[in-house]
Amino acid sequence: MLVKVFSFFILMITMVVIGVSKEYCDDKHSCQNFLLELKTASSSLSEIRRRDLLIIVLKNSVRKIDMAMIGVMEDTKQHEEMENDKLCLKEDTNLFEEMMESAKDRMIRSVEELLGGEFPYLGSYENIHTWLSGVLTSYITCIDEIGDGAYKRRVEPQLQDLISKAKVALALFISISPRDNTELNSVVPNSPSWLSHVDKKDLYLNAEALKKIADVVVAKDGTGKYNTVNAAIAAAPQHSHKRFIIYIKTGIYDEIVAIENTKPNLTLIGDGQDSTIITGNLSASNVRRTFYTATFASNGKGFIGVDMCFRNTVGPAKGPAVALRVSGDMSVIYRCRVEGYQDALYPHIDRQFYRECFITGTVDFICGNAAAVFQFCQIVARQPNMGQSNFITAQSRETKDDKSGFSIQNCNITASSDLDTATVKTYLGRPWRIFSTVAVLQSFIGDLVDPAGWTPWEGETGLSTLHYREYQNRGPGAVTSRRVKWSGFKVMKDPKQATEFTVAKLLDGETWLKESRIPYKSGL
Protein backbone atom coordinates (compact mmCIF):
# COMPACT_ATOMS: atom_id res chain seq x y z
CA MET A 1 0.00 0.00 0.00
CA LEU A 2 2.78 2.45 0.95
CA VAL A 3 4.56 1.71 -2.32
CA LYS A 4 1.40 2.55 -4.26
CA VAL A 5 0.92 5.80 -2.35
CA PHE A 6 4.55 6.81 -2.92
CA SER A 7 4.27 5.95 -6.62
CA PHE A 8 1.16 8.11 -6.83
CA PHE A 9 3.00 11.04 -5.29
CA ILE A 10 5.92 10.54 -7.65
CA LEU A 11 3.51 10.52 -10.57
CA MET A 12 1.98 13.78 -9.37
CA ILE A 13 5.42 15.35 -9.12
CA THR A 14 6.23 14.27 -12.67
CA MET A 15 3.07 15.97 -13.85
CA VAL A 16 4.09 19.33 -12.42
CA VAL A 17 7.79 19.35 -13.17
CA ILE A 18 7.35 19.36 -16.95
CA GLY A 19 7.15 23.13 -17.00
CA VAL A 20 10.57 23.58 -15.41
CA SER A 21 12.55 20.55 -16.53
CA LYS A 22 14.51 21.74 -19.56
CA GLU A 23 15.80 24.99 -18.15
CA TYR A 24 17.32 23.40 -15.09
CA CYS A 25 18.59 20.15 -16.58
CA ASP A 26 20.87 21.26 -19.35
CA ASP A 27 23.94 21.63 -17.17
CA LYS A 28 23.87 19.10 -14.32
CA HIS A 29 23.63 15.32 -14.56
CA SER A 30 22.13 15.21 -11.08
CA CYS A 31 19.21 17.37 -12.17
CA GLN A 32 18.70 15.25 -15.27
CA ASN A 33 18.63 12.13 -13.14
CA PHE A 34 16.20 13.74 -10.71
CA LEU A 35 13.76 14.74 -13.43
CA LEU A 36 14.19 11.43 -15.23
CA GLU A 37 13.29 9.73 -11.97
CA LEU A 38 10.11 11.78 -11.87
CA LYS A 39 9.22 11.09 -15.55
CA THR A 40 7.51 14.17 -16.85
CA ALA A 41 3.89 13.77 -17.89
CA SER A 42 1.65 16.86 -17.63
CA SER A 43 1.66 20.37 -16.15
CA SER A 44 -2.08 20.98 -15.93
CA LEU A 45 -2.40 20.73 -12.14
CA SER A 46 -4.16 23.20 -9.89
CA GLU A 47 -2.09 25.54 -7.73
CA ILE A 48 -3.25 23.72 -4.61
CA ARG A 49 -1.89 20.49 -6.07
CA ARG A 50 1.34 22.25 -7.00
CA ARG A 51 1.67 23.38 -3.41
CA ASP A 52 1.22 19.81 -2.22
CA LEU A 53 3.87 18.63 -4.65
CA LEU A 54 6.28 21.32 -3.53
CA ILE A 55 5.84 20.15 0.05
CA ILE A 56 6.76 16.62 -1.05
CA VAL A 57 9.84 17.87 -2.91
CA LEU A 58 11.00 19.86 0.13
CA LYS A 59 10.46 17.01 2.55
CA ASN A 60 12.39 14.74 0.20
CA SER A 61 15.24 17.27 0.10
CA VAL A 62 15.35 17.42 3.90
CA ARG A 63 15.80 13.65 3.96
CA LYS A 64 18.51 13.94 1.29
CA ILE A 65 20.37 16.45 3.48
CA ASP A 66 20.23 14.10 6.47
CA MET A 67 21.56 11.26 4.33
CA ALA A 68 24.29 13.44 2.83
CA MET A 69 25.46 14.65 6.24
CA ILE A 70 25.66 11.12 7.60
CA GLY A 71 27.46 9.85 4.51
CA VAL A 72 29.97 12.68 4.42
CA MET A 73 30.63 12.39 8.16
CA GLU A 74 31.36 8.67 7.92
CA ASP A 75 33.52 9.14 4.83
CA THR A 76 35.47 11.96 6.47
CA LYS A 77 36.24 9.83 9.53
CA GLN A 78 37.64 7.13 7.28
CA HIS A 79 39.91 9.56 5.42
CA GLU A 80 40.75 12.01 8.21
CA GLU A 81 44.27 10.73 8.74
CA MET A 82 45.03 11.20 5.04
CA GLU A 83 44.21 14.93 5.14
CA ASN A 84 47.34 17.09 5.18
CA ASP A 85 45.72 20.35 6.27
CA LYS A 86 43.71 19.70 9.43
CA LEU A 87 42.67 23.37 9.75
CA CYS A 88 41.18 23.39 6.27
CA LEU A 89 39.41 20.10 6.94
CA LYS A 90 37.88 21.47 10.14
CA GLU A 91 36.71 24.66 8.42
CA ASP A 92 35.29 22.73 5.47
CA THR A 93 33.48 20.26 7.74
CA ASN A 94 32.03 23.06 9.86
CA LEU A 95 30.93 25.00 6.79
CA PHE A 96 29.28 21.98 5.19
CA GLU A 97 27.36 21.14 8.36
CA GLU A 98 26.37 24.77 8.98
CA MET A 99 25.09 25.31 5.45
CA MET A 100 23.21 22.02 5.43
CA GLU A 101 21.49 22.99 8.68
CA SER A 102 20.78 26.41 7.19
CA ALA A 103 19.10 24.88 4.14
CA LYS A 104 17.24 22.32 6.21
CA ASP A 105 15.88 24.97 8.58
CA ARG A 106 14.63 27.10 5.68
CA MET A 107 12.91 24.17 4.01
CA ILE A 108 11.19 23.13 7.23
CA ARG A 109 9.98 26.70 7.75
CA SER A 110 8.78 26.79 4.15
CA VAL A 111 6.76 23.61 4.60
CA GLU A 112 5.18 25.02 7.76
CA GLU A 113 4.31 28.22 5.90
CA LEU A 114 2.90 26.31 2.93
CA LEU A 115 0.61 24.45 5.30
CA GLY A 116 -0.41 27.68 7.06
CA GLY A 117 -3.67 29.45 6.44
CA GLU A 118 -2.21 32.59 4.82
CA PHE A 119 -0.48 31.01 1.82
CA PRO A 120 -0.42 32.10 -1.01
CA TYR A 121 -1.20 35.64 0.17
CA LEU A 122 1.68 38.04 -0.33
CA GLY A 123 3.30 38.09 3.12
CA SER A 124 3.42 34.31 3.37
CA TYR A 125 4.40 33.98 -0.28
CA GLU A 126 7.37 36.35 0.10
CA ASN A 127 8.55 34.49 3.20
CA ILE A 128 8.74 31.21 1.32
CA HIS A 129 10.31 32.81 -1.74
CA THR A 130 13.02 34.28 0.49
CA TRP A 131 13.71 31.04 2.31
CA LEU A 132 13.83 28.85 -0.80
CA SER A 133 16.28 31.31 -2.32
CA GLY A 134 18.28 30.95 0.89
CA VAL A 135 18.33 27.18 0.50
CA LEU A 136 20.01 27.53 -2.88
CA THR A 137 22.43 30.14 -1.54
CA SER A 138 23.42 27.84 1.33
CA TYR A 139 24.40 25.08 -1.09
CA ILE A 140 26.28 27.43 -3.39
CA THR A 141 28.16 28.91 -0.44
CA CYS A 142 29.51 25.42 0.20
CA ILE A 143 30.63 25.00 -3.40
CA ASP A 144 32.28 28.43 -3.40
CA GLU A 145 34.00 28.21 -0.04
CA ILE A 146 35.14 24.62 0.40
CA GLY A 147 38.71 24.33 -0.79
CA ASP A 148 39.77 22.17 -3.70
CA GLY A 149 40.88 18.84 -2.32
CA ALA A 150 39.74 15.43 -1.16
CA TYR A 151 36.94 16.77 1.04
CA LYS A 152 35.41 18.78 -1.79
CA ARG A 153 35.56 15.76 -4.08
CA ARG A 154 33.58 13.84 -1.48
CA VAL A 155 30.86 16.43 -0.93
CA GLU A 156 30.50 18.00 -4.37
CA PRO A 157 28.30 15.28 -5.93
CA GLN A 158 25.80 15.62 -3.08
CA LEU A 159 25.93 19.41 -3.29
CA GLN A 160 25.36 19.48 -7.03
CA ASP A 161 22.39 17.17 -6.62
CA LEU A 162 20.94 19.37 -3.87
CA ILE A 163 21.53 22.52 -5.95
CA SER A 164 19.57 21.00 -8.81
CA LYS A 165 16.70 20.06 -6.50
CA ALA A 166 16.70 23.57 -5.00
CA LYS A 167 16.40 25.11 -8.47
CA VAL A 168 13.51 22.80 -9.30
CA ALA A 169 11.80 23.68 -6.00
CA LEU A 170 12.21 27.39 -6.71
CA ALA A 171 10.82 27.06 -10.22
CA LEU A 172 7.92 24.97 -8.94
CA PHE A 173 7.19 27.60 -6.31
CA ILE A 174 7.29 30.42 -8.87
CA SER A 175 4.65 28.55 -10.88
CA ILE A 176 2.22 29.30 -8.02
CA SER A 177 0.85 32.83 -8.27
CA PRO A 178 0.70 35.00 -5.15
CA ARG A 179 -2.58 36.55 -4.11
CA ASP A 180 -2.87 40.18 -3.16
CA ASN A 181 -4.78 40.75 0.05
CA THR A 182 -4.32 44.30 1.27
CA GLU A 183 -5.75 43.64 4.69
CA LEU A 184 -3.62 40.56 5.33
CA ASN A 185 -0.50 42.10 3.84
CA SER A 186 -0.71 45.34 5.82
CA VAL A 187 -1.34 43.82 9.22
CA VAL A 188 1.70 44.11 11.46
CA PRO A 189 1.83 41.61 14.34
CA ASN A 190 1.24 42.87 17.86
CA SER A 191 4.01 45.03 19.22
CA PRO A 192 6.72 42.72 20.58
CA SER A 193 7.10 42.34 24.33
CA TRP A 194 10.35 44.32 24.34
CA LEU A 195 8.30 47.47 23.64
CA SER A 196 6.06 46.96 26.66
CA HIS A 197 8.36 49.10 28.83
CA VAL A 198 8.76 51.79 26.17
CA ASP A 199 6.22 54.32 24.99
CA LYS A 200 4.60 52.55 22.04
CA LYS A 201 3.54 55.95 20.74
CA ASP A 202 7.17 56.56 19.79
CA LEU A 203 7.25 56.13 16.04
CA TYR A 204 10.95 55.31 15.93
CA LEU A 205 13.33 53.35 18.08
CA ASN A 206 14.54 55.19 21.19
CA ALA A 207 18.01 53.82 21.82
CA GLU A 208 18.45 55.54 25.19
CA ALA A 209 15.17 54.12 26.47
CA LEU A 210 16.10 50.62 25.31
CA LYS A 211 19.47 50.81 27.07
CA LYS A 212 17.61 51.26 30.35
CA ILE A 213 15.57 48.10 29.85
CA ALA A 214 18.39 45.99 28.37
CA ASP A 215 18.42 42.38 29.50
CA VAL A 216 22.20 42.46 29.96
CA VAL A 217 24.92 45.11 29.84
CA VAL A 218 28.45 44.64 28.47
CA ALA A 219 31.19 46.97 29.70
CA LYS A 220 34.98 46.89 29.47
CA ASP A 221 35.26 48.76 32.78
CA GLY A 222 33.35 46.18 34.79
CA THR A 223 30.16 48.22 35.23
CA GLY A 224 28.11 45.68 33.29
CA LYS A 225 27.18 42.07 33.91
CA TYR A 226 29.68 40.94 31.27
CA ASN A 227 32.90 42.35 29.87
CA THR A 228 32.76 40.58 26.49
CA VAL A 229 30.13 40.57 23.77
CA ASN A 230 30.41 36.80 23.39
CA ALA A 231 29.54 36.22 27.04
CA ALA A 232 26.40 38.32 26.71
CA ILE A 233 25.29 36.50 23.56
CA ALA A 234 25.90 33.15 25.26
CA ALA A 235 23.44 34.26 27.95
CA ALA A 236 20.68 34.91 25.42
CA PRO A 237 17.92 32.28 25.30
CA GLN A 238 17.63 29.86 22.41
CA HIS A 239 14.63 29.73 20.08
CA SER A 240 13.01 32.66 21.87
CA HIS A 241 10.08 34.58 20.40
CA LYS A 242 10.80 37.49 22.74
CA ARG A 243 13.42 40.09 21.95
CA PHE A 244 16.61 39.97 24.02
CA ILE A 245 18.39 43.33 24.33
CA ILE A 246 22.14 43.63 24.90
CA TYR A 247 23.56 47.07 25.66
CA ILE A 248 27.28 47.33 24.84
CA LYS A 249 28.93 50.32 26.45
CA THR A 250 31.73 52.41 24.98
CA GLY A 251 34.91 50.42 24.37
CA ILE A 252 36.97 48.48 21.86
CA TYR A 253 36.00 44.81 21.98
CA ASP A 254 38.68 42.72 20.30
CA GLU A 255 36.80 39.48 19.72
CA ILE A 256 35.30 37.36 16.97
CA VAL A 257 31.54 37.18 17.47
CA ALA A 258 29.12 34.72 15.89
CA ILE A 259 25.41 34.59 16.71
CA GLU A 260 24.00 31.13 16.04
CA ASN A 261 20.74 30.63 14.19
CA THR A 262 19.27 29.17 17.38
CA LYS A 263 19.30 32.69 18.88
CA PRO A 264 16.76 34.82 17.01
CA ASN A 265 15.43 38.24 17.98
CA LEU A 266 18.61 39.72 19.44
CA THR A 267 19.10 43.48 19.63
CA LEU A 268 22.60 44.86 20.21
CA ILE A 269 22.79 48.57 21.06
CA GLY A 270 26.04 50.48 21.44
CA ASP A 271 26.96 54.03 22.41
CA GLY A 272 27.66 55.11 18.84
CA GLN A 273 29.55 53.96 15.77
CA ASP A 274 32.70 55.72 16.96
CA SER A 275 32.36 54.59 20.58
CA THR A 276 31.33 50.91 20.68
CA ILE A 277 33.72 49.04 18.40
CA ILE A 278 33.91 45.29 17.75
CA THR A 279 37.17 44.54 15.98
CA GLY A 280 39.01 41.56 14.53
CA ASN A 281 41.78 40.72 12.08
CA LEU A 282 40.89 37.45 10.36
CA SER A 283 41.40 37.11 6.61
CA ALA A 284 41.50 34.49 3.90
CA SER A 285 45.26 34.35 4.42
CA ASN A 286 44.93 32.88 7.92
CA VAL A 287 41.39 31.47 8.13
CA ARG A 288 41.23 30.20 4.55
CA ARG A 289 37.45 30.47 4.15
CA THR A 290 36.00 33.96 3.58
CA PHE A 291 32.80 32.93 5.36
CA TYR A 292 34.70 32.57 8.64
CA THR A 293 36.75 35.77 8.40
CA ALA A 294 33.90 37.90 9.74
CA THR A 295 34.63 39.91 12.86
CA PHE A 296 30.90 39.80 13.58
CA ALA A 297 28.51 37.25 12.07
CA SER A 298 24.79 37.08 12.74
CA ASN A 299 22.89 33.95 11.73
CA GLY A 300 19.79 34.59 13.82
CA LYS A 301 16.47 35.74 12.40
CA GLY A 302 15.34 39.22 13.42
CA PHE A 303 18.76 40.58 14.42
CA ILE A 304 18.95 44.33 15.07
CA GLY A 305 22.29 46.14 15.42
CA VAL A 306 22.29 49.80 16.48
CA ASP A 307 24.97 52.43 17.11
CA MET A 308 28.18 50.42 16.88
CA CYS A 309 31.15 49.69 14.64
CA PHE A 310 32.08 46.36 13.05
CA ARG A 311 35.72 46.48 11.99
CA ASN A 312 38.23 44.19 10.30
CA THR A 313 41.71 45.64 10.62
CA VAL A 314 43.35 43.40 8.01
CA GLY A 315 44.75 45.65 5.31
CA PRO A 316 44.08 45.53 1.58
CA ALA A 317 46.94 43.15 0.79
CA LYS A 318 45.59 40.00 2.50
CA GLY A 319 42.52 39.32 0.40
CA PRO A 320 38.96 38.79 1.61
CA ALA A 321 38.43 39.90 5.20
CA VAL A 322 34.84 40.42 6.32
CA ALA A 323 33.93 42.92 9.02
CA LEU A 324 30.21 42.08 9.17
CA ARG A 325 28.36 39.06 7.78
CA VAL A 326 24.58 38.87 8.13
CA SER A 327 22.90 35.53 7.40
CA GLY A 328 19.56 35.88 9.19
CA ASP A 329 16.20 36.85 7.76
CA MET A 330 14.56 40.18 8.66
CA SER A 331 17.79 41.70 9.96
CA VAL A 332 18.29 45.44 10.50
CA ILE A 333 21.53 47.41 10.83
CA TYR A 334 20.95 51.00 11.96
CA ARG A 335 23.44 53.85 12.44
CA CYS A 336 26.38 51.45 12.35
CA ARG A 337 29.85 51.63 10.84
CA VAL A 338 31.19 48.73 8.76
CA GLU A 339 34.89 49.10 8.15
CA GLY A 340 37.19 46.85 6.15
CA TYR A 341 38.77 46.36 2.76
CA GLN A 342 37.95 43.43 0.48
CA ASP A 343 34.50 41.89 1.19
CA ALA A 344 34.01 44.23 4.15
CA LEU A 345 30.23 43.77 4.31
CA TYR A 346 28.73 40.37 3.47
CA PRO A 347 24.91 40.46 3.25
CA HIS A 348 24.88 36.73 2.75
CA ILE A 349 21.27 35.60 2.62
CA ASP A 350 17.60 36.51 3.20
CA ARG A 351 16.06 39.99 3.77
CA GLN A 352 18.18 42.76 5.27
CA PHE A 353 17.79 46.51 5.82
CA TYR A 354 20.61 49.03 6.37
CA ARG A 355 19.78 52.58 7.43
CA GLU A 356 22.10 55.54 8.05
CA CYS A 357 25.22 53.37 8.08
CA PHE A 358 28.81 54.18 7.13
CA ILE A 359 30.23 51.42 4.92
CA THR A 360 33.80 51.54 3.67
CA GLY A 361 36.01 49.12 1.75
CA THR A 362 37.76 48.36 -1.52
CA VAL A 363 37.21 45.20 -3.60
CA ASP A 364 33.64 43.83 -3.67
CA PHE A 365 33.05 45.52 -0.35
CA ILE A 366 29.31 44.87 -0.38
CA CYS A 367 28.99 41.25 -1.52
CA GLY A 368 26.55 38.37 -1.15
CA ASN A 369 23.13 37.11 -2.19
CA ALA A 370 20.78 38.77 0.27
CA ALA A 371 17.80 40.89 -0.64
CA ALA A 372 19.20 44.06 0.93
CA VAL A 373 18.14 47.70 0.86
CA PHE A 374 20.54 50.47 1.88
CA GLN A 375 18.90 53.80 2.73
CA PHE A 376 20.63 57.08 3.62
CA CYS A 377 23.99 55.35 4.00
CA GLN A 378 27.49 56.73 3.42
CA ILE A 379 29.23 54.31 1.05
CA VAL A 380 32.91 55.18 0.92
CA ALA A 381 35.57 53.60 -1.31
CA ARG A 382 39.08 53.67 0.12
CA GLN A 383 42.60 53.08 -1.20
CA PRO A 384 43.02 49.43 -2.32
CA ASN A 385 46.16 47.38 -2.73
CA MET A 386 48.52 48.45 -5.49
CA GLY A 387 47.15 47.55 -8.92
CA GLN A 388 43.61 46.89 -7.69
CA SER A 389 40.38 48.62 -8.62
CA ASN A 390 37.45 49.23 -6.30
CA PHE A 391 34.13 47.44 -6.80
CA ILE A 392 31.39 48.66 -4.52
CA THR A 393 29.07 45.68 -5.04
CA ALA A 394 29.40 42.03 -6.01
CA GLN A 395 25.90 40.60 -5.85
CA SER A 396 25.61 36.86 -6.43
CA ARG A 397 22.09 36.03 -7.58
CA GLU A 398 22.22 32.55 -9.12
CA THR A 399 18.93 32.18 -11.01
CA LYS A 400 16.13 34.37 -12.32
CA ASP A 401 13.86 32.81 -9.68
CA ASP A 402 16.00 33.95 -6.73
CA LYS A 403 14.52 36.49 -4.34
CA SER A 404 17.62 38.64 -3.94
CA GLY A 405 19.34 41.84 -5.00
CA PHE A 406 20.92 45.01 -3.61
CA SER A 407 19.17 48.37 -3.67
CA ILE A 408 21.15 51.52 -2.82
CA GLN A 409 18.60 54.28 -2.23
CA ASN A 410 19.18 57.90 -1.14
CA CYS A 411 22.80 57.14 -0.30
CA ASN A 412 26.06 59.04 -0.84
CA ILE A 413 28.78 57.20 -2.79
CA THR A 414 32.07 59.00 -2.22
CA ALA A 415 35.83 58.55 -1.87
CA SER A 416 37.80 58.42 1.35
CA SER A 417 40.48 61.03 1.86
CA ASP A 418 43.22 58.46 1.13
CA LEU A 419 41.78 57.23 -2.19
CA ASP A 420 43.83 58.34 -5.19
CA THR A 421 41.01 58.77 -7.70
CA ALA A 422 43.48 59.73 -10.42
CA THR A 423 45.05 56.25 -10.49
CA VAL A 424 42.42 53.95 -8.94
CA LYS A 425 39.28 53.05 -10.84
CA THR A 426 36.08 52.58 -8.86
CA TYR A 427 32.96 50.87 -10.20
CA LEU A 428 29.44 50.55 -8.84
CA GLY A 429 29.71 46.80 -9.14
CA ARG A 430 30.56 43.63 -11.01
CA PRO A 431 28.49 40.44 -11.38
CA TRP A 432 29.59 37.72 -8.97
CA ARG A 433 27.01 35.46 -10.63
CA ILE A 434 25.12 35.68 -13.90
CA PHE A 435 21.85 37.06 -12.51
CA SER A 436 23.58 39.63 -10.31
CA THR A 437 21.03 42.31 -9.37
CA VAL A 438 21.86 45.83 -8.15
CA ALA A 439 19.92 49.11 -8.36
CA VAL A 440 21.22 52.56 -7.43
CA LEU A 441 18.29 54.89 -6.82
CA GLN A 442 18.06 58.61 -6.01
CA SER A 443 21.63 58.66 -4.71
CA PHE A 444 24.63 60.99 -4.94
CA ILE A 445 27.48 59.44 -6.94
CA GLY A 446 30.83 61.18 -6.65
CA ASP A 447 33.43 61.57 -9.38
CA LEU A 448 35.34 58.56 -8.07
CA VAL A 449 33.04 56.27 -10.11
CA ASP A 450 34.33 55.46 -13.59
CA PRO A 451 32.09 56.78 -16.40
CA ALA A 452 31.38 53.17 -17.44
CA GLY A 453 29.77 52.69 -14.05
CA TRP A 454 29.98 48.90 -14.03
CA THR A 455 32.55 46.31 -15.05
CA PRO A 456 32.51 42.58 -15.98
CA TRP A 457 33.63 39.87 -13.59
CA GLU A 458 35.13 37.70 -16.32
CA GLY A 459 34.73 38.16 -20.05
CA GLU A 460 31.14 38.38 -21.26
CA THR A 461 29.72 36.19 -18.49
CA GLY A 462 26.38 37.42 -17.19
CA LEU A 463 26.29 40.68 -19.14
CA SER A 464 22.96 39.85 -20.77
CA THR A 465 21.34 38.17 -17.75
CA LEU A 466 22.34 40.51 -14.92
CA HIS A 467 20.03 43.30 -13.74
CA TYR A 468 21.93 46.55 -13.15
CA ARG A 469 19.73 49.61 -12.84
CA GLU A 470 20.10 53.33 -12.12
CA TYR A 471 17.33 55.78 -11.36
CA GLN A 472 17.32 59.53 -10.73
CA ASN A 473 20.84 59.73 -9.33
CA ARG A 474 22.83 62.95 -9.05
CA GLY A 475 26.44 64.06 -8.81
CA PRO A 476 29.41 63.99 -11.20
CA GLY A 477 29.52 60.18 -11.22
CA ALA A 478 25.82 59.86 -12.04
CA VAL A 479 26.13 60.88 -15.69
CA THR A 480 25.01 57.83 -17.70
CA SER A 481 25.95 58.83 -21.26
CA ARG A 482 29.14 56.73 -21.13
CA ARG A 483 27.75 53.80 -19.16
CA VAL A 484 28.25 50.19 -20.29
CA LYS A 485 26.13 49.08 -23.24
CA TRP A 486 25.22 45.65 -21.87
CA SER A 487 21.69 44.42 -22.44
CA GLY A 488 21.45 43.71 -18.72
CA PHE A 489 22.04 47.37 -17.77
CA LYS A 490 19.30 49.98 -17.93
CA VAL A 491 18.71 53.55 -16.82
CA MET A 492 15.16 53.50 -15.51
CA LYS A 493 12.77 56.31 -16.43
CA ASP A 494 9.54 54.79 -15.20
CA PRO A 495 9.01 55.01 -11.41
CA LYS A 496 7.01 51.77 -11.59
CA GLN A 497 10.19 49.96 -12.62
CA ALA A 498 12.21 51.59 -9.84
CA THR A 499 9.56 50.66 -7.29
CA GLU A 500 10.56 47.00 -7.69
CA PHE A 501 13.77 47.82 -5.78
CA THR A 502 12.16 49.53 -2.79
CA VAL A 503 11.65 48.31 0.77
CA ALA A 504 8.02 47.47 0.06
CA LYS A 505 8.77 45.36 -3.00
CA LEU A 506 12.25 43.89 -2.58
CA LEU A 507 12.00 43.22 1.17
CA ASP A 508 8.23 42.99 1.66
CA GLY A 509 9.18 45.41 4.41
CA GLU A 510 5.70 46.56 5.35
CA THR A 511 5.04 43.16 6.94
CA TRP A 512 8.01 43.19 9.34
CA LEU A 513 10.06 46.40 9.45
CA LYS A 514 7.53 48.37 11.49
CA GLU A 515 8.16 46.08 14.45
CA SER A 516 11.79 47.16 14.57
CA ARG A 517 10.84 50.83 15.08
CA ILE A 518 13.70 51.69 12.72
CA PRO A 519 12.80 54.53 10.33
CA TYR A 520 12.48 53.47 6.70
CA LYS A 521 11.15 54.72 3.41
CA SER A 522 8.75 52.18 1.97
CA GLY A 523 8.73 53.44 -1.61
CA LEU A 524 10.58 55.98 -3.73
Swiss-Prot record:
Residues linked to a glycan: N265, N281, N412
Compartments where located: Secreted, Cell wall
Organism domain of life: Eukaryota
Disulfides per UniProt: C357-C377
UniProt tissue specificity: Expressed in siliques but not in flower buds.
Major site of localization recorded for this protein: secreted
Annotated substrate binding sites: T290, R430, W432
Site residues, Transition state stabilizer: Q342
Active site feature: D343 (proton donor), D364 (nucleophile)
Stored Gene3D superfamilies: Invertase/pectin methylesterase inhibitor family protein, Single-stranded right-handed beta-helix, Pectin lyase-like
Family (UniProt): In the N-terminal section; belongs to the PMEI family. In the C-terminal section; belongs to the pectinesterase family.
Note: The PMEI region may act as an autoinhibitory domain and prevent untimely PME activity during transport.
Name of the molecule in the record: Probable pectinesterase/pectinesterase inhibitor 42
Lineage: Eukaryota, Viridiplantae, Streptophyta, Embryophyta, Tracheophyta
